[in-house]
């Protein structure tokens, strides 16, 4: 899943900016204070990564409008179907038919390379927010289509402050296998799109296996069941007997929260080779934090599967000397072959691996408003960056 078209109106210093034909990498270059970060923030707002604030509105207080076009591949669509997003149909053909009804602005596209057909499609919509805090997703058919928000791609963002802990947590989630992801989601053992309601109908299936044969997800369900038996079964039975005796007609259902999120949380510390002590990430120097960030991203590029996410980084070159800046550019290039990358920079050292279609120059017009130049001239950009 990736952005292919962007149109931003009335967001901070942006009056009207259009970026067409966006590829797997979108590199926003320009001098300081030209509005590169503003474009990234606008995308994060429209894609639900950050909330709208009062400072995001122009001086005239008009509505913010951020129109986007998202490309969805066949793998993206199958992933949405498997997770029960947009529609509850389990068979893909039925799911896709319902998907198109609920998202009428989705346009299927079929391309052939002579041997196989590449199935994909584009979804167009406009995020609109007013100064009263109300927001909606307009798709040209419905004033507010609630289904759009359900399929927006995950955003992994890195600000100049280098909030590495958040990015690390996100990337570790991507490295875990499907079983751990299911444990986190709280889904049913038999149906991923269904939320577990602690009916424990899966216990019969689990009991047919030897302990060594259980996977992590099945073992967690068995733990749920044993904890329930230990703590709640008799209590629940007594409460329901008294509830019915006193006129109650429904059933009281108890469940135990094992706080899977905390149980599966990974702690990262920096160990010293010379001293027997560890330090937290927050105690690292700025240069080392940037190097660790690059190491995280490089590990991310080694993942085999294509992921429905967009990585947004402000000034990857920050705190890095020129040699490491070039390394950062190489890592970002490899990363963009896996999924979409959007980053800002005013360092020419990061541009060597990218083509002119992936680089857009951000400048100020005569009124001090941010604009994106239609044609990319690398020599002009390099002169501008110095």
List the model feature ranges, each with a label.
Residues 61-66, 72, 122-123, 151-155, ...:
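Short glycine-/polar-rich loops that comprise or flank the Walker A/P-loop
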Residues 1-48, 265-386:
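Switch/communication elements of ASCE P-loop NTPase nucleotide-binding domains
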Residues 83-202:
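A sensor for short, sequence-defined functional sites
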Residues 52-56, 140-144, 344-347:
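Short beta-alpha junctions and helix-cap segments that line functional grooves
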Residues 169-292, 296-310:
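Extended helical coiled-coil dimerization/tether regions that scaffold
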Residues 40-116:
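Conserved P-loop NTP-binding catalytic core
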Residues 75-80, 165-169, 350-353, 368-373:
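Switch/connector loops and helix/strand junctions flanking conserved nucleotide-binding motifs
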